[in-house]
Structures are given as structure tokens and as C-alpha cells.
């Protein structure tokens, strides 16, 4: 185009072509003028390219005494693989990192002041955060000094504290145990005021009484809460106890009181939550005091996550009436740790059933809750979606799906629920899919499959959604098809086909691989198992199950696969098998209490749940759970009595 006599031309491929060539030059070491030394690894690059991407490197290059020579930059605290990821990004604008490497990429981006990359990595970590990992994510965010990331993690912890309290990371945290004696007819104040007084007491114990935080955590501490709302030290109830005052007093005290120089031991909250040395790499800012989240778990029993003098820890607090009506003598503390939940505050009861009986449903864990969607009963395919809270043993409804659907599977991808394919009970198999947005409690259509698909397996792997196998339009034989959905491009593409046709198979992810288990080729049940490697796009047959089955469910627990129930060609079955990938072996486990075919199976926390299904006579709405320690299934649950 030549406006006003000037030639105007825009080459749409120039930038992409040029950056690809630049990256090739970097990898071959041509025209490079900077050497990065990263923990003994040497990397060559071009100063001009790196200076455009990294303000940190720009400052270094700009201060070079010889701007025309070779620059040398040394890093002893970065992961070489992470730096290589950032170099590729600098040359291609594409950020590609294995999930295990994202934290290191974040750290390197922070060092190099690549804020956009740091934010993208932080958002990725948040999308993968759950109740099992949020504590380590908080330690990481605190160590990095990222207030945005830290605030989002803290908000998640506040919402899911009770679920988090059952996880291994929580149990490893250092803990402060408090027994608060109450005068007659006196109740503890609200969480906020209560823990402000507790923090005040901890500070005074450390800086005025000379205690260390580690010493305070070694045994249960006895405090006394009087009728005039004063918190007294239970060990000094002879009238010499210090009264801990208002919030203003607390703030002034923190500002004015300098750290004591003494020989007391220090502790820190490591990434695993264990006690560690003062120079541990993961520690909150020194002298930070903060209540992160708290819950009243029962009458006068409180649970709290807090930062005490920079240490992320747990505070257990139990209030009980004192045998004395006034602090004239020290109350005696039971060695049974009565600050913890008492046995009579736990009740065992049959698990609440779903509102609807359903078979061929989709199930998944999301935010510590069990989601059960769709399915069919004797009358119809369902649109309804139910959500189970394990801590209250209560089912509630979420927004219904747009389309009635059964004989499908559901998966969580980047924090969102996806349902794909299935049958609506009236027409041919479905090609449509939906995504549940919890922010608006509604389902949003996703791009359709290229072919209709029923009885297929669905699973999330490496940030993408896979749909595997399924039945043909006539429902008479299985398929080998495998397709993958990219939530960024919104496109479905094909990947390597299965070795064996199969439908009604169980599908899940474990250790970076995708597993498809059992199913049927036509109507003959299979015991064969295939494993997909996304690195080389191949399916491999591995050890077969002991029992051929279709319509089974699968869940992951402690790094192993548990395949539950199904149909063996004659009957609905209750048997369960466990696969150990390190041994490539299957082992029979404890049976479910009821036969279940086409049931929903999912892991929530450290528990496997089985919901719904068909027992050979009835469509089920019942629930049962698996206890790994006892190798038993039970239709009962224990919940706190409020």
C-alpha cells in the first residue's frame, strides 16, 4: 500500500522469525557478549536482549567499565534450569516450565526483576494450591516477600482452615498450646480480641520474662481470663501477674520493645513446617506478628494459624471453667491436653446421602469439597449438581448444568470444573462440554469435541484436559481416540491413540502420567491398563488388574491408584484394587460395603469417597469412605458437635 507516495509494508512473520533466529544464535554461542555463571553452569547470551527483559541486568550492563567487551555475571543462588527458562522467554516470549520448576523460575524472575514473569508464576502456583499444599505455598510467598501472593494464600487459608488442619503440613507446624481458665459465667471474647491478647502475652513472655518461643511451645501454658476481661499468667496467679491491656498497648509495645540479646534458642517455620535452625531459608519477616486465620471448633475451643515473631505456627486454645472462682491459687492443668477436641465432642453418624440417587455421574474434589454432577436414575438423566462438605456432613446444591448428562467424567483444570461429552438420555452422544465458574455459580460452554463421545475418560494433566476412549455412536464398541484441550488456545487436538479400544474405563493422573484402567472393548470387560507419557506422546501397557471390570471408579491416595467397584460382566462388584507404580503391581484391598457400578470415586483430603452408582438392584444416593490405616470402608463419619 502506497499512501501519499510512500511505500508501507508490514511483515507479519518478521518478529517471530527474527526472535527464533536470535535464540538459535544464542544456543550456538554466535555474537554473544555476556556470560552468565549460574552455580557453575555457563550460559551465553546477548546483552541487548537481556537488558530489554531484565531491569536488574540492564543496571549491571549499564555500569560496565568496558561496554564493548564481554560481560560476566555470576549467580550462586539461582537454579540453572530456571535461568534457562527465562533466557528462552527473553528470546521467544514463551514461558515453558515443568510444574516442579515454577518456584525456582519465580525466584529467578524476582532476582532479575522480571515482574511480569514473577506474576505469571505466582498465578500458576495459586491455581494449583489446595489444602495439602497451601502452607508450603505460604512459606514460599513469605520467603519471597510477595505481599500480593501472600495475601491470596492467607485468604485461601482463612476459608479452608478446618480442612487444612487435617493435612500433614499442618501437623508438622510448631504449635503453642494454651489452657485458659475462666471464672464462673465468663466466656472467652471473639476471635480477634482473644488472639490479640494472646499475642500480647507471648510478646511479654519473651521480652520481659526472658522466655523463648521454643520454651513456650514445649508444654501447655496455663492462663487465666477474669470477669473484668483481663488475661493473666496462670503461673503467677498469686496477684503478681501482669495484666495485658488494650490493642493500643499491644501496638506500642511492639514498636518500642527492642529484641533481647540472650542465648535462647530460636525456631523457624520451615517449608515443611518443622522446627529448624535460625538460619533456615524459609522464615517470615523478623518480628512479624499476625493472626492468619482462626476458627472456633467447639464450645470454648479455638484453632488458629499465626505468625509469632516471624514464625508461622499453630495456636490451640481451650477455655474451661476454673475450679477456683478467683485467682488465689494456681489452677491444676490436666496432662490429657484438654485444649484439644474432647472425645465427647466428636459424634459418629451415618453419612448424609445425596438428594438424588445417581449412576454414571461425574465426581471431583474442589476446594476441599466433593462435587457430584449429573448421572441418571430410573427416570431420567440429571442436570443437578450437589456439593458435599466433609466437615459438616452436609450436601448443598450448586447451579445445575446447562445440559442433562450421564455416562461422563469430570475433572478440575486450573481450579475450574470441566464436564465433557456423555449422553442426555434422548439423543446421540454429546460433543458439548461445560465449565463451572464458582465465582458466579454458573456453567459456561466450552468448545465442542470434534466427535460425539459417551462413556469416555476425562482427566487433567499438565494444564490441559484429556478425553480418552469412549463408545461409538451406537454404543456397541470402544474407541481408541484420545484428544486434548488447551484452555489457553481453546482448541481440541488429537494425541496418540490407545493400544486397545475401550469405553467405561477409569482414568486419572499420577506422577505426570495419565492412566486408563479396565473398561470394555465391546461388552467384554477388560483388566488391561495403559499409561500415557505426554513427553513422547505414547501409550504403554502396564501390569493388568486382578479383576476385569468396566464402570469402575479410580482415585489417587498416597501416590497409589485405587480402583473401586464396577461391573465384571455378570454383577456389580464391591472389590477394590491398589496399584503401586514403583512396583508395577496390583494388590486386592478391602471391599466397599456395597457393590457399586458407575459410581463416583474421588479423594478429598486423605480420604477416598464412593458416592452413588448402581448395586444391581437399585440406583444409590449413599456415601461411604475408605480408611487407609484399617483398610476398611465405612458408611459412617465423625464430625464435631457444635
Swiss-Prot record:
Question: Where does the record place the region Sufficient for AHR interaction and signaling?
Answer: 164-368
Q: Which residues carry this modification: Phosphoserine?
A: 246, 277, 322, 336, 338
Question: Which Gene Ontology cellular component terms are annotated?
Answer: Cul3-RING ubiquitin ligase complex; cytoplasm; cytoskeleton; cytosol; nucleoplasm; spliceosomal complex; transcription regulator complex
Q: Which GO terms describe its molecular function?
A: ubiquitin-like ligase-substrate adaptor activity
Annotated ranges, domain BACK: 132-350
Q: Which GO terms describe its biological process?
A: intrinsic apoptotic signaling pathway; mRNA processing; negative regulation of intrinsic apoptotic signaling pathway; negative regulation of protein ubiquitination; proteasome-mediated ubiquitin-dependent protein catabolic process; response to virus; RNA splicing; transcription by RNA polymerase III
Gene3D superfamilies recorded for this chain? 1.25.40.420, Kelch-type beta propeller, Potassium Channel Kv1.1, Chain A
Residue segments, region Disordered: 257-281
Chief site of localization = cytoplasm
Q: Which SMART domains match?
A: BACK (SM00875), BTB (SM00225), Kelch (SM00612)
What keywords are assigned to this protein? Cytoplasm, Cytoskeleton, Host-virus interaction, Kelch repeat, mRNA processing, mRNA splicing, Nucleus, Phosphoprotein, Repeat
Does the keyword field hold Phosphoprotein?
yes
Annotated BTB domain residues: 1-131
The Kelch repeat boundaries are 384-421, 432-469, 481-518, 527-565, 575-612, 622-642
Keyword Nucleotide-binding: yes or no? no
Pfam families membership: BACK (PF07707), BTB (PF00651), Kelch_1 (PF01344), Kelch_KLHDC2_KLHL20_DRC7 (PF24681)
From start to end residue, where is composition biased (Polar residues)?
265-281
Q: Which residues form a coiled coil?
A: none
Give compartment(s). Cytoplasm; Cytoplasm, Cytoskeleton; Nucleus, Nucleoplasm
User: Quaternary arrangement and interactors, per the entry?
Assistant: Homodimer; through the BTB domain. Interacts with AHR/Aryl hydrocarbon receptor. Interacts (via BACK domain) with pre-mRNA-binding protein HNRNPK; the interaction is direct. Interacts (via BACK domain) with splicing factor PTBP1; the interaction is direct. Interacts (via Kelch repeats) with RNA polymerase POLR2A (via C-terminal domain). Interacts (via BACK domain) with splicing factor SNRPA; the interaction is indirect. Interacts (via Kelch repeats) with splicing factor SART1. Interacts (via BACK domain) with ALYREF; the interaction is indirect and likely plays a role in mRNA nuclear export.
Disease annotation reads: Immunodeficiency 70: A primary immunodeficiency clinically characterized by human papillomavirus-associated warts on the hands, feet and face, recurrent bacterial infections, and autoinflammatory features, such as colitis, celiac disease, and retinal vasculitis. Immunologic workup shows decreased CD4+ T cells, decreased CD19+ B cells, and hypogammaglobulinemia. IMD70 inheritance is autosomal dominant with incomplete penetrance.
- Domain notes per entry: When the BTB domain is lacking, AHR signaling induction promoted by IVNS1ABP is massively increased; Thus, the BTB domain inhibits AHR signaling induced by IVNS1ABP. Dimerization is necessary for proper splicing activity of IVNS1ABP and this is mediated by the BTB domain. The BACK domain is necessary for proper viral M mRNA export.
Give the function comment from the record: Involved in many cell functions, including pre-mRNA splicing, the aryl hydrocarbon receptor (AHR) pathway, F-actin organization and protein ubiquitination. Plays a role in the dynamic organization of the actin skeleton as a stabilizer of actin filaments by association with F-actin through Kelch repeats. Protects cells from cell death induced by actin destabilization. Functions as modifier of the AHR/Aryl hydrocarbon receptor pathway increasing the concentration of AHR available to activate transcription.
- Give the family, as the similarity comment puts it: Belongs to the BTB-kelch protein family.
Protein name as it appears in the record: Influenza virus NS1A-binding protein
Organism, by scientific name, is: Homo sapiens
Q: What's the name of its gene?
A: IVNS1ABP
